[in-house]
């Protein structure tokens, strides 16, 4: 595997020179953050990002993410225009030497948590998800503002989007995902980009919205939509691991054995009840995911792709983007490296 780290560009408090100092760190996972969703990413912006990263002795290994416009997910007549823009962005990325793109198909909201600064017993702060809190929350109230959410919506436009989704069933969303995949994958194949869909986080419906990339059966169905080795998965242990029915090592061996895992997020979570969890340190005993068994599965399939530590706790007084501080993710990266060295020896 190739160890990577998420970086949110020049405004990120976690500097590239700090990331470079993490033992074994090779690559960066990033994106262009100042182009509106649905717009074409200019080649010069991609090159500027890549060159900045390379000046620090790292490589731009994965784009996470190129967002999918809501009109595509809703199946609106305007989707074709946004799909053409998406294709052009893929062409620009390939021309800049990028070969892996992570994306998701979660309606309206990206990853969702009920609290960003829950204090754990050791004094660190973590992201948590409590189903009873979310079920009582009105997404229009402004009570929850999460880093994973698209804050470009004004309250009225968000209300309109949520209203539109009341007419969209899971099967409708599958139809729209199929349309999107079958439209973009010929271009991805043409330019040599591996597309890696990220599972829904958490892997169940929230606020009455359909979510369809949640388990092994869903991923099988996804891969059946288009026959290409470039059509694949971001295997996220934190997202899929929130549901204890998901056997992560088995899924890694199954999909990785097909060569369909193009990118991996390795993190731990502690399940605290039905549809509830806390994000924990990466250490196996800190949560519900057997990290050693998971990394061994990656080793056994000969995984050589990019893998990154995912959300970390806030520790040692660090302040910054929830889940994306330096210290705990650096500890996580070193822990993952240690497991990899052990299973490889």
UniProtKB/Swiss-Prot annotation:
Pfam family of the protein (one): UxuA
SUPFAM superfamilies annotated for this entry?
Xylose isomerase-like
Matching entries from InterPro entries are given as: Man_deHydtase, Xyl_isomerase-like_sf
Q: Which GO terms describe its biological process?
A: D-glucuronate catabolic process
Cofactor or coenzyme needed = Fe(2+); Mn(2+)
Q: Output the Gene3D superfamilies linked to this UniProt entry.
A: Divalent-metal-dependent TIM barrel enzymes
Top EC class, one word: lyase
Which HAMAP family does the protein's record reference?
A: UxuA
Family assignment?
A: Belongs to the mannonate dehydratase family.
Q: Which NCBIfam families match?
A: PRK03906.1, uxuA
Protein name per UniProt: Mannonate dehydratase 2
Q: Which organism is it from?
A: Halalkalibacterium halodurans (strain ATCC BAA-125 / DSM 18197 / FERM 7344 / JCM 9153 / C-125) (Bacillus halodurans)
**What's the name of its gene?**
uxuA2
């Amino acid at each position: 595997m190739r160890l990577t780290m998420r970086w949110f560009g020049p405004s990120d408090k976690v500097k590239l020179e700090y990331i470079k100092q993490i033992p074994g760190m090779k690559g960066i996972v990033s994106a262009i953050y100042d182009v509106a969703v649905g717009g074409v990413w200019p080649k010069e912006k991609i090159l500027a990002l890549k060159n900045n990263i390379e000046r620090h002795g790292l490589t731009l290994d994965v784009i996470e993410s190129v967002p999918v416009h809501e009109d595509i997910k809703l199946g609106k007549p305007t989707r074709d225009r946004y799909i053409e823009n998406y294709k052009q962005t893929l062409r620009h990325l390939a021309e800049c030497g990028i070969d892996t793109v992570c994306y998701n198909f979660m309606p309206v909201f990206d990853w969702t948590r009920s609290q960003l600064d829950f204090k754990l017993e050791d004094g660190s702060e973590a992201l948590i998800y409590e189903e009873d809190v979310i079920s009582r929350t009105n997404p229009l109230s402004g009570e929850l503002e999460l880093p994973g959410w698209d804050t470009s919506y004004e309250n009225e436009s968000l209300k309109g989007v949520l209203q539109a989704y009341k007419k969209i069933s899971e099967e409708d969303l599958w139809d729209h995902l199929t349309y999107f995949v079958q439209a973009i994958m010929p271009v991805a194949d043409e330019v040599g980009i591996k597309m890696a869909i990220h599972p829904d986080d958490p892997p169940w419906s929230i606020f009455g919205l359909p979510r369809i990339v949640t388990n092994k059966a869903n991923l099988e169905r996804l891969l059946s939509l288009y026959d290409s080795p470039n059509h694949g998965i971001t295997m996220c242990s934190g997202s899929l691991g929130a549901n204890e029915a998901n056997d992560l090592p088995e899924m890694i061996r199954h999909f990785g054995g097909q060569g369909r895992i193009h990118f991996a997020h390795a993190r731990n979570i502690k399940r605290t009840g039905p549809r509830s969890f806390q994000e924990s340190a990466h250490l196996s005993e800190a949560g519900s995911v057997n990290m050693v068994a998971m990394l061994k599965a990656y080793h056994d399939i000969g995984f050589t792709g990019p893998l990154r530590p995912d959300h970390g706790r806030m520790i040692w007084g660090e302040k910054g983007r929830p889940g994306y501080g330096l210290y705990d993710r650096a500890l996580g990266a070193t822990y993952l490296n240690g497991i990899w060295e052990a299973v490889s020896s």
